[in-house]
Amino acid sequence: METSVNFDPSNMPQHVAIIMDGNGRWAKKQGKLRVFGHQNGVNAVRAAVHFAAKYGIKVLTLYAFSSENWNRPATEVSALMSLFIQALNTEVSKLHKHNIRLNILGDKTRFSDSLQKRIIESETLTAHNTRLTLNIAANYGSHWDITEATKKLAEKVKLGKISVTDITPEKVQRALVTAEQPPVDLLIRTSGEQRISNFLLWQIAYAELFFSDVLWPDFDETSFSEAIYAYQQRERRFGGCE
């Protein structure tokens, strides 16, 4: 749904992250299987990407599949993997056409060889695009992310490239999967749930949080606008005083 908005362009978040929640409940309300909700959630992804590109957000990170989601029923996991491949096959050329870069964040080694190959192709095709960076967090968990960053730094210490005293928050940040990207300014979670679910724990240290009651497949430009308006009305202090 398109809506007329009037944001303060000087106060737009650079990096917005969204926990896309509520597909299963949305499907249940329709009397359908959970996979029906996931399929319709793709439309909300398109809307969110369009909105972010339209209003100058530089990085959009979407939580698509957590490392804990492997514990879901095998049929649902299989359907999600099929949907992932289908989305890459149909959407990447459109992203490239609109100058949008695609990154897949997470441990890709558990994916099938064909999916890993398609991910590499998609990231390579869009690598030099500059309008918007779209991060899809898939088989991602923040504990994994921070652990892997720690391993990278420990290996550098072991090889004598750095000393323990050289390790700073900035070096940890650069070892995370988000690397040189800006920290998250605004974290949105849909469906009314109010928890972080092991998502970008380091990156959201000073993020503003917005919890929407809208189920993800119904999340549209109006819903996104409400989150941006709320963000622009807040005073970010980053630990300082008023």
From Swiss-Prot:
One Gene Ontology term, aspect cellular component: cytosol
Protein name as annotated: Ditrans,polycis-undecaprenyl-diphosphate synthase ((2E,6E)-farnesyl-diphosphate specific)
Catalytic activity as recorded in UniProt: 8 isopentenyl diphosphate + (2E,6E)-farnesyl diphosphate = di-trans,octa-cis-undecaprenyl diphosphate + 8 diphosphate
GO molecular function annotations of the record: ditrans,polycis-undecaprenyl-diphosphate synthase [(2E,6E)-farnesyl-diphosphate specific] activity; magnesium ion binding
Cofactor comment: Binds 2 magnesium ions per subunit.
Coiled coil: none
Family the entry assigns: Belongs to the UPP synthase family.
Sites where the protein binds Mg(2+): D21, E208
Enzyme Commission number: 2.5.1.31
Organism name: Haemophilus ducreyi (strain 35000HP / ATCC 700724)
Enzyme class: transferase
Record-listed substrate binding positions: 22-26, 34, 38, 66-68, 70, 72, 189, 195-197
Active site annotation, chain numbering: D21, N69
GO BP term, pick one: cell wall organization
Keywords: Cell shape, Cell wall biogenesis/degradation, Magnesium, Metal-binding, Peptidoglycan synthesis, Transferase
Role, per record: Catalyzes the sequential condensation of isopentenyl diphosphate (IPP) with (2E,6E)-farnesyl diphosphate (E,E-FPP) to yield (2Z,6Z,10Z,14Z,18Z,22Z,26Z,30Z,34E,38E)-undecaprenyl diphosphate (di-trans,octa-cis-UPP). UPP is the precursor of glycosyl carrier lipid in the biosynthesis of bacterial cell wall polysaccharide components such as peptidoglycan and lipopolysaccharide.
NCBIfam families the UniProt entry points to: PRK14830.1 (NF011405), uppS (TIGR00055)
Co-factor(s): Mg(2+)
Family matches, as Gene3D superfamilies: Decaprenyl diphosphate synthase-like
The protein's assembly and partners: Homodimer.
